[in-house]
Amino acid sequence: MAPSAPAKTAKALDAKKKVVKGKRTTHRRQVRTSVHFRRPVTLKTARQARFPRKSAPKTSKMDHFRIIQHPLTTESAMKKIEEHNTLVFIVSNDANKYQIKDAVHKLYNVQALKVNTLITPLQQKKAYVRLTADYDALDVANKIGVI
């Protein structure tokens, strides 16, 4: 079945317009000044894994309860509590000062001003946690059960 008369005329008019307008773009030949062709950098999308390599993500073994092992209750520790507003803890050897400060905040709801650490001759890490002026180390020690 042949196309209808109005469709034919529409197609002819469209062709006429294209002829009158002429070719829009002219292909310009690129001048190459080098004998070496450097391949252009193209988009490289990130690879997507088809399945996870581990069935469950690894949980952190350094939780707050592992970082702070126990408070120290020696006479020198009591003196620090009374005179310097400082709590003394035995902590994990793997913990750093930031982790200790965060663990004290999470476990005892107190803000630490600074943390000093040392390794004892018994290869234990001891942390001196100085509290801010807002908190009293004696009250916190009572709450913990040190005194």
From Swiss-Prot:
SUPFAM superfamilies noted in UniProt: Ribosomal proteins S24e, L23 and L15e
Cysteines engaged in disulfide bonds, as pairs: none
Chain coiled-coil ranges: none
Ranges of biased composition (kind: Basic residues): 18-29
Residue stretches of biased makeup (Low complexity): 1-10
One biological process term in Gene Ontology: translation
Superkingdom classification of source: Eukaryota
Keyword flag Protease: no
Keywords: Ribonucleoprotein, Ribosomal protein, RNA-binding, rRNA-binding
GO cellular component: cytosolic large ribosomal subunit
GO molecular function list: rRNA binding; structural constituent of ribosome
PROSITE patterns attached to this UniProt entry: RIBOSOMAL_L23
Annotated stretches, region: Disordered: 1-29
Pfam families attached to this UniProt entry: Ribosomal_L23, Ribosomal_L23eN
Gene3D superfamilies associated with the record: 3.30.70.330
Chain's role: This protein binds to a specific region on the 26S rRNA.
Family listed: Belongs to the universal ribosomal protein uL23 family.
Protein name: Large ribosomal subunit protein uL23A
